[in-house]
């Protein structure tokens, strides 16, 4: 999907297909935003469908020019948005966070999913199934090498179940996500 001639990454859609959350490069004054290590920063956006066009493209309020917010995933009830970020409060290089989506379309305060999921390394690319299982990539949990795909059950009380490496053939000695 291209909006404003800028490519979108990792789109996730509401069940009715009328709202899309997606990742974009962080452009600052017409240039790609970068951190002090020259890494391109990312931001999350929301767009709504009007007929056959995507409109009302808005930047999510917890984005920043100082860190990345990327890779959105929706909970089955569409009331929680999961994402990866290196925002303040991150335990490692990047962590999985969640934020509530309020009935009026506003957002709560992003919450780090904690040290059962997040490590001192990278956790990224969350995906939530209809059964409330969270799949994510990590190179901080024991794996086969590089980023591996892991799964855990998201519980109604906000806790998570045990973390399981999904194993081969999904995971390899290379980065898998």
Task: Spell out what each predicted region is.
Residues 1-177:
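Short, conserved micro-motifs composed of acidic
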